[in-house]
């Protein structure tokens, strides 16, 4: 059976907060509206906080929302979830387990990065250095343009030369039909060799 809000004796944590007896809410009949508001007691600021200001649930703590099982009850307006209460998968509250603290964030000044992170950082720095080395100074740019033009001229020459040689070999091969077959086999062999 689920524990009622009246069974909870305090909302303050174990850091010196004083335990206060639980107040029993007035009983509502089953058909009564659940949107009744109660006056907050104990804190004149109107925050409804019964814990001392030094506790984690002090005046700056966000208000806890009722759980999904508490909102089904007509008394859900009196339920306030505490940090001491944890809920198992069945929805019942228990005091047995404590919530684990949030994991600490990575302090970049004291912690070394993980090996994958180190490898990725090394890759990024290597790529940055390659980009910097590809940016040549202005005094080398004319030589690079000349080299690119010479390469283009060489590529054009190779393209026209291979066409002439292939055309001449084909004309000579017309005289010898076996040479046509050998030239085609050689071409197929080169094509297959390049694909592997």
UniProtKB/Swiss-Prot annotation:
Its tissue distribution reads: Expressed in a number of B- and T-lymphoid cell lines.
- Keyword vocabulary terms for this entry: Apoptosis, Membrane, Mitochondrion, Phosphoprotein, Ubl conjugation
Q: Give the induction text.
A: By ER stress.
Q: Name one GO cellular component term.
A: intracellular membrane-bounded organelle
Region described as Disordered: spans on this chain: 1-68
Q: Where is the protein situated, by its record's location annotation?
A: Membrane; Mitochondrion
Can you summarize the PTM annotation of this record?
Phosphorylation at Ser-65 by MAPK1/MAPK3 leads interaction with TRIM2 and ubiquitination, followed by proteasomal degradation. Deubiquitination catalyzed by USP27X stabilizes the protein.
Highest taxon of the source? Answer: Eukaryota
BH3, short sequence motif: residues: 146-160
Membrane topology designation: Peripheral membrane protein
Q: Give a Pfam family name.
A: Bclx_interact
Q: What result follows from mutating residue 65 to A?
A: Loss of TRIM2-binding
**What biological-process GO terms show up in the record?**
apoptotic process involved in embryonic digit morphogenesis; B cell homeostasis; cell-matrix adhesion; developmental pigmentation; ear development; extrinsic apoptotic signaling pathway in absence of ligand; in utero embryonic development; intrinsic apoptotic signaling pathway in response to DNA damage
Q: Which residues carry this modification: Phosphoserine?
A: 65, 73, 83, 90
**Can you provide one Gene Ontology molecular function annotated for this UniProt record?**
microtubule binding
Q: What does this protein do?
A: Induces apoptosis and anoikis. The isoforms vary in cytotoxicity with isoform BimS being the most potent and isoform BimEL being the least potent.
Q: How does this protein assemble?
A: Forms heterodimers with a number of antiapoptotic Bcl-2 proteins, including MCL1, BCL2, BCL2L1 isoform Bcl-X(L), BCL2A1/BFL-1, and BCL2L2/BCLW. Interacts with BAX (in vitro); this interaction may induce the conformationally active form of BAX. Does not heterodimerize with proapoptotic proteins such as BAD, BOK or BAK. Identified in a complex containing BCL2L11, DYNLL1 and BCL2L1 isoform Bcl-X(L); BH3 integrity is required for BCL2L1-binding. Interacts with YWHAZ. When phosphorylated, interacts with TRIM2; this interaction is associated with ubiquitination and degradation.
What information about domains appears in the record's comments?
Answer: The BH3 motif is required for the interaction with Bcl-2 proteins and cytotoxicity.
* Recorded family membership: Belongs to the Bcl-2 family.
- Its recorded name reads Bcl-2-like protein 11
**Primary gene name:** Bcl2l11
